[in-house]
Design a protein with these regions (language model features):
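An acidic, low-aromatic, low-complexity terminal/linker signal
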Residues: 1-161
Length: 161
């Protein structure tokens, strides 16, 4: 049994292992970053650290949504990088039996660009288990790793002494 954070996007429930989650909080907005990919909603400060926010609706090819009182960011860490995921809501942590995970049908994994790696049936609910490294572009060529890796060293030589 592993703990998972359950979150929703456009009425569909997804799950992410708790081990990848640092914290969850209400999302009130982010500072926009010029030139960032469309799925990067901007940056926020979390515990004194500037963190990029990925709008999972846009990343998954869904239409963007307005902010509501339920909108959350799930602050995650993968391969030493901290990233916040904007979701419609996140209110539940569940114990899921890993033995009951089923591979995502090909049509789902292809349509979801590999972001979903398994499905978990929980009573009459189906939870789509997300692949965080895939979302963060760690397993395919993507602009996001470069954005996350930039520590400001490129800009420093341009700053006046």
């Amino acid at each position: 049994m592993n703990l998972h954070v359950v979150f929703a996007l456009a009425g569909t429930e997804y799950a992410l292992p708790v081990g990848a989650v640092l914290q969850m909080e209400t999302f009130a907005g982010a500072t926009l970053v010029p030139g960032a990919p469309s799925y990067v909603a901007g940056i926020v400060t979390v515990r004194g650290l500037v963190v990029p926010v990925i709008d999972l609706r846009v990343r998954f090819g869904l239409p963007p949504a307005e902010l509501t009182l339920d909108t959350r960011i799930i602050v995650t860490e993968s391969s030493g990088r901290v990233v916040a995921l904007r979701v419609d809501s996140a209110r539940e942590v569940l114990k899921l039996d890993v033995e009951k995970h089923q591979p995502a049908p090909t049509v789902i994994s292809e349509r979801a660009s590999g972001f979903v790696h398994a499905v978990h049936a929980l009573g009459n609910r189906l939870l789509l288990l997300v692949d965080l490294p895939q979302i963060l572009g760690e397993t395919k060529h993507d602009q996001l790793p470069q954005l996350l890796a930039d520590d400001g060293s490129k800009a420093r030589p341009q700053l006046p002494s």
